[in-house]
Amino acid sequence: MTFSKPLLATAFVAIGALFGASAPAVAAEKTVTFAYQDMMTPIRVLMESGELEKKTGYAVKWVKFGGGGDVIRAMSSGNVDIGEAGSSPIAAAASQGLPITLFWILDDIANAEQLVARNGSGIKSIADLKGKTVAVPFVSTSHYQLMYALQEAGLSGKDVKLLNMRPPEIAAAWERGDIDATFIWAPVLTAAKKNGTVIASAGDFARKGKATFDGIVATKAFMAANPDFMTTFVKLLAAADADYAKTGDSWTVGSPQVAAVAKWTGAAPTDVPDGLAAYRFLNVQEQASKEWLGGGAAEALKSTAEFLKSQGRVTELAPDYGPFVTADVVKAAAK
């Protein structure tokens, strides 16, 4: 089913009201390349609406990637200006000194990532993973959580057959019956649960001090050269999340919002409402707070990096993770 731009424009009344009717005049078209993934979040409605392009005058190239590690590599090579990545690949990038900055928490992962075992595999607990084949995107938040889960159960990566796969590859391997378990997010998670059982979730580990999140990062060079774009972008991100917080009950199958999320993520529309509900989205005040961009996010990156180093996934730690996080753009957007 397709939906017209007027329907999405109606869904974005709250966003349009923030700015007025006309887009800013620009001398020449500027371009930004944005790397996104398949997480079900309100930003997909913004992407479909065209509001970012309209309000900034920039041409936005939306490029889909299979995992945060791929996004970080593309940013490192100069092919991407802004991208979505989980706290684990962001921590790895910061540890390597990549000149990027986390400026927005896309979501608190909460229960949106889960360890699922195939029915009939004999896996009833994390300890039962010993000797089994488990797929996960390496250096992702799911990988970080899986390694922590194994450690807590007295196992290591050597005790299981770990396969590094992107989400689409995991979906295909699960369909073929090639893997026994996976730690992954929707829409692959939704498909796996149809003939699998949830063994653990990200929320279980968050309650033990191993919280994970997805963030939006930009290269320091792009941020410095495009401050007005960054402020407008964050205003629109905040408006999209606020709209979901206020009207989320109406984001149902058949709504333009769900259609947009399904289109950009590749998820089935019927899976989108539950996919969105599995995450927690922060308001502007929470974003800028000391628990998040005001300090907590940097501490989370440090803790994640230390764990990654203990697992041999990074070789060095940054002396300070604060320079890789900023609340300044959120504060500017809130004015």
What are these regions (language model features)?
Residues 1-11:
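Bacterial N-terminal signal peptides that target proteins for export
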Residues 9-20:
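Bacterial N-terminal signal peptides
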Residues 21-27:
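Sec/Tat signal peptide C-region and signal peptidase I cleavage site
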Residues 28-156, 161-164, 180-186, 202, ...:
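Short, glycine-/small- and polar/acidic-enriched structural segments
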Residues 70-72, 90, 170-173, 188-189, ...:
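Short, hydrophobic alpha-helical packing/hinge segments within bilobed ligand-binding/sensory domains
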Residues 106-117, 198-222, 234, 321-328:
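Periplasmic-binding protein-like
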Residues 224-313:
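Secondary-structure end/capping motifs
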Residues 298-335:
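Conserved C-terminal helix/tail region of periplasmic/extracytoplasmic solute-binding proteins
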